[in-house]
């Protein structure tokens, strides 16, 4: 498998004791909606392949490339922050008390947003979720610096 969402769903189904999807159909749909804001609206415009294309093929200056990144992450984070605020269940994660697929999609984008110096002042909910997730060992072990192929 090579696509993040397919990998996450595969692992969720293979190891059901972790259960990244809520049991009820409404919250399952909500998880998919929130996860897709990140996976479909933010990530495709800001992945490494796109950023390299902007730089190497279109000769976009670094400042303009950074502005591109910031524009699209801000658009996505605005939508995500507002969506979570409107429907957030009580708890430290995107869907309340339990870690979900949404959190797994959010944290890598938060990492990239910091890397591209996106201000988090307008995203208190996302920032609090990030803080909670990064306190977990699994998220600490998954940071890019800890990966064997880190650049």
Predicted regions and their residues:
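Active-site-flanking alpha-helical
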Residues: 12, 109-110, 143
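GST-like fold's C-terminal all-alpha helical module
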Residues: 38-135
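GST-like domain detector, emphasizing the conserved glutathione-binding G-site
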Residues: 1-64
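Short coil/turn segments at secondary-structure boundaries
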Residues: 47-48, 143-145
């Amino acid at each position: 498998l090579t696509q993040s969402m397919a990998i996450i769903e595969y692992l969720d189904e293979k190891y059901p004791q972790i259960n990244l999807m809520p049991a009820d159909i409404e919250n399952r749909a909500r998880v998919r909606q929130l996860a897709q804001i990140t996976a479909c609206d933010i990530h495709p415009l800001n992945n490494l392949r796109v950023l390299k294309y902007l730089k190497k093929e279109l000769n976009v200056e670094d400042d303009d490339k950074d502005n591109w990144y910031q524009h699209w992450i801000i658009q996505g984070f605005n939508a995500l922050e507002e969506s979570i605020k409107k429907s957030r269940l009580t708890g430290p994660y995107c869907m309340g008390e339990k870690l979900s697929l949404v959190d797994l999609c959010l944290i890598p984008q938060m990492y990239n947003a910091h890397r591209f110096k996106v201000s988090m002042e307008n995203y208190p909910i996302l920032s609090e979720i990030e803080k909670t997730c990064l306190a977990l060992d699994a998220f600490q072990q998954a940071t890019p610096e800890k990966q064997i192929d880190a650049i």
